[in-house]
């Protein structure tokens, strides 16, 4: 085989060799000649016209990856390449730049008051070390390649802008000075947009005729396979699929506070199956918990009676220190002053409370109101009747614990609702007045919330957003915390003789749950009941008052965005360490396990109520996180019924189309749902029927479907928020627009893990770090 000593290859020589030797022997002989010979052959082989020489693909393509891997190992043994410096190794402090940012803090005065003071803190701007600019550019280029899908001629201006934005974010992350930032952005970004040899080889491997032929063969085979009762995979993807609800995969702890007794009667279980629409889902796994004895006990154990400590053990929730809430009483007095500045607080009538509800819930409250006229309220009416909440939960990363709703009787709710239901908005406005700005953002549509959060962000020179994770807030609402909350209501009705009893009944809770298995679960507890009519209002009062007191105590000037237990603090970057060092311990003394999340320095990365700000056509709006693309494709309604399915698609398409007008990906999914619903005219009654609870808050006063064009600036903002680059956005939108939807659904015993054509890993937030 002396002919292999020639370092030049042509197709005729290869034909001669193949006629005499096997492909494996040929490649082995080339490898034995050394790395130069192998590299020359590999470069020549990948340059072949595979359409013209399919025989070369058949003989050598299956063997190329193995031999390439072997020769790479040989190269490593011959010479160990010098590791390239990391970006941080290429940088040093730029002493020529003396930029500072203003750090605000409160200082105690002799009279005991606190005075706001601004302190200049150095920015610590960096520059590239002498002679290391090429290494710095290479380091940034590598991070860009790992973050972006490098395209060919179809790469547009928006994609280029996204790559440059990534390079700029990297430079901003390391605080590189303006001059070197400009050099790195243009060099690294455009080098990364040029495919390297590895990218070219991988593309040839994936798209050569032989690989395409194999994919075609699989497509032919799929047409002859029955898929869970469907004719083909395409049939499965395009139709609604019904599968059973499930038990949570958790063991029962055996807590003595929970008792199970036999009962002759049993509760009728309404929700036994879930229906999903694979063709429009984003691929995340979604589960719904069934009403079962196992789920009820697990939920009570892990969401009411026990919490996990740092070692993963289940323990009793932390209790507040004695007198822990005394230092927050000033907030109640300030709140009361703001509340009464708008006039006295008036107790409502029973009929006014009933009028607050609609549909089936209104009928239930009308029945409860009728009984109050001849049978006075009794403490037994405050007993809790628990049930498993039917909700769509993402379960890719971790199996969620079932959620229990613990409401009291309609009679009790009507009586306490006379004090709180119609006064709730006014009480929340008083919280805003104490803070001096809009703080409680519930009740605002997504655009109003986006404007409010952007306004808070713009108040600071070097702003950061800090999420406060109040894990299982209701479970941590101790008896002392509830008493503190109730003191706000007592201040509003100091001479009333009924309200104290109604509030005291919330401190000692006796609950039960009737299960379909003819079992009765009984328990007693002293924490917040999630079904109480004042749960939302009470959580906002507690959280806002505690955060206000904490910020005042540590002397940090910060702005709060609140919606119950969802909290985000906005402040100067220099204040993060003080918050991070003290907040958890401060809240733990009051019985709450609060976690300070990592700060974000980009407005689009702020997470509030599972939504993030996106600049849509120059205006900020909150856009739901990517998991909503999957959750909206599942329902406990009977989507196997064509009429119900069309109504649901119409309602979802309308609502999401209005909320996400001009938003990448989200609007495309909504538009396809609306088309599946028949493109019917906007019907407020039909929408209200499908979305009884939150449609008004979501839509605000908007009722027109516009289907606005997605602007390039919006794609970039969406990219910063969710890490989905513009090219992928357009690919997914094209997929949604071409998806086929059938109304002829079927039942399956389970939903496959990868049930959607959009793989779950495609639409997940991807950030630089």
Curated annotation (Swiss-Prot):
Database matches in SUPFAM superfamilies: DNA/RNA polymerases
Keyword field: Nucleotide-binding, Nucleotidyltransferase, RNA-directed RNA polymerase, Transferase, Viral RNA replication
EC numbers, comma separated: 2.7.7.48
GO molecular function, a single term: RNA-directed RNA polymerase activity
Keyword Nucleotide-binding set for record: yes
Keyword Cytoplasm among UniProt keywords: no
A single BP term in Gene Ontology: viral translational frameshifting
Transmembrane intervals: none
Catalytic activity: RNA(n) + a ribonucleoside 5'-triphosphate = RNA(n+1) + diphosphate
Record-annotated RdRp catalytic domain positions: 463-579
Top-rank lineage group of the source organism: Viruses
Pfam families attached to this UniProt entry: RdRP_3 (PF00998)
Assigned protein family: Belongs to the tombusviridae RNA polymerase family.
UniProt function note: Probable polymerase.
Protein name: RNA-directed RNA polymerase
Species, as recorded: Carnation ringspot virus (isolate Lommel) (CRSV)
């Amino acid at each position: 085989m002396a002919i292999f000593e020639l370092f030049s290859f042509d197709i005729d020589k290869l034909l001669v060799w193949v006629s005499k030797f096997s492909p494996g022997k040929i490649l082995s002989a080339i490898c034995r000649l050394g790395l130069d010979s192998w590299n020359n052959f590999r470069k020549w082989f990948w340059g072949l016209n595979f359409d013209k020489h399919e025989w070369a693909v058949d003989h050598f393509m299956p063997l190329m990856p193995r031999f390439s891997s072997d020769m790479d190992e040989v190269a490593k043994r011959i010479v160990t390449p010098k590791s390239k410096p990391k970006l941080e190794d290429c940088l040093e402090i730029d002493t020529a730049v003396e930029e500072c940012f203003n750090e605000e803090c409160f200082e105690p005065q002799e009279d005991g008051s606190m005075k706001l003071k601004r302190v200049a803190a150095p920015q610590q701007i960096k520059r590239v070390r002498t002679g290391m600019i090429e290494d710095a550019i290479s380091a940034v280029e590598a991070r860009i390649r790992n973050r972006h899908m490098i395209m060919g001629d179809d790469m547009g201006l928006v994609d280029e802008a996204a790559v440059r934005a990534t390079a700029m974010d990297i430079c901003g992350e390391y605080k590189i000075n303006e001059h070197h930032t400009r050099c790195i952005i243009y060099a690294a970004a455009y080098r990364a947009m040029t495919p390297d040899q590895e990218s070219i080889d991988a593309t040839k491997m994936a798209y050569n005729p032989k690989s395409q032929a194999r994919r075609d063969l699989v497509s032919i085979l799929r047409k002859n396979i029955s898929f869970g009762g469907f004719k083909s995979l395409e049939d499965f993807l395009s139709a609604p699929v019904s599968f059973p609800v499930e038990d949570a995969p958790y063991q029962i702890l055996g807590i003595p506070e929970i008792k199970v007794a036999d009962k002759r009667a049993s509760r009728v279980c309404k929700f036994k199956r879930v229906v999903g629409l694979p063709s429009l889902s984003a691929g995340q796994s979604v589960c719904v918990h069934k009403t079962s004895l196992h789920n009820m006990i697990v939920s009570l154990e892990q969401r009411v009676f026990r919490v996990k400590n740092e070692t993963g053990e289940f323990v009793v929730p932390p209790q507040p220190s004695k007198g822990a809430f005394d230092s927050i009483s000033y907030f109640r007095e300030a709140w009361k002053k703001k509340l009464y500045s708008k006039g006295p607080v008036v107790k409502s009538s029973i009929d006014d409370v009933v009028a607050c509800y609609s549909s089936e819930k209104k009928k239930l409250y009308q029945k409860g109101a009728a009984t109050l006229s001849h049978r006075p309220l009794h403490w037994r009416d405050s007993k809790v009747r628990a049930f498993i909440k039917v909700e769509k939960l993402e379960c890719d990363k971790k199996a969620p614990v079932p959620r229990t709703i613990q409401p009291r009787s309609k009679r009790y709710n009507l009586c306490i609702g006379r004090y709180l239901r119609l006064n709730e908005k006014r009480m929340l406005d008083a919280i805003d007045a104490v803070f001096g700005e809009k703080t409680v953002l519930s009740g605002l549509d997504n655009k109003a919330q986006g404007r409010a959060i952007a306004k808070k962000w713009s108040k600071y020179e070097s702003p950061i957003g800090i999420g406060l994770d109040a894990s299982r807030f209701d479970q941590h609402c101790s008896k002392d915390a509830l008493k503190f909350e109730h003191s706000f209501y007592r201040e509003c009705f100091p001479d009333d003789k009924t309200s104290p009893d109604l509030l005291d009944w919330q401190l000692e809770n006796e609950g039960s749950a009737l299960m379909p298995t003819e079992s009765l679960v009984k328990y007693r507890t002293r924490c917040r009941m999630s079904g109480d009519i004042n749960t939302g209002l009470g959580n906002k009062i507690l959280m806002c008052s505690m955060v206000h007191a904490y910020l005042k105590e540590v002397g940090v000037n910060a702005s709060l965005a609140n919606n119950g237990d969802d909290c985000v603090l906005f402040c100067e970057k220099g204040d993060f360490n003080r918050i991070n060092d003290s907040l958890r311990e401060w809240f733990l003394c009051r019985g709450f396990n609060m976690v300070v999340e990592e700060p974000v320095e980009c407005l689009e990365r702020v997470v509030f109520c599972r939504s993030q700000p996106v600049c849509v056509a120059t205006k900020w709006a909150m856009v739901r996180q990517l998991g909503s693309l999957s959750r909206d494709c599942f329902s406990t309604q009977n989507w196997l019924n064509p009429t119900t399915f069309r109504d649901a698609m119409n309602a979802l398409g309308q609502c999401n189309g209005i909320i996400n007008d001009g938003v990448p990906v989200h609007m495309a999914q909504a538009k396809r749902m609306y088309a599946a619903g028949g493109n019917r005219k906007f019907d407020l009654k039909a929408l209200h029927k499908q979305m009884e609870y939150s449609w008004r808050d979501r839509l605000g006063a908007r009722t027109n479907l516009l289907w606005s064009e997605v602007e390039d600036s919006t794609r970039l903002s969406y990219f910063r928020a969710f890490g989905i680059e513009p090219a992928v956005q357009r690919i997914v939108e094209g997929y949604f627009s071409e998806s086929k939807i059938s109304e002829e659904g079927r039942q399956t015993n389970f939903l496959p893990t990868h049930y959607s054509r959009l793989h779950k890993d495609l639409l997940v937030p991807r950030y630089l770090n």
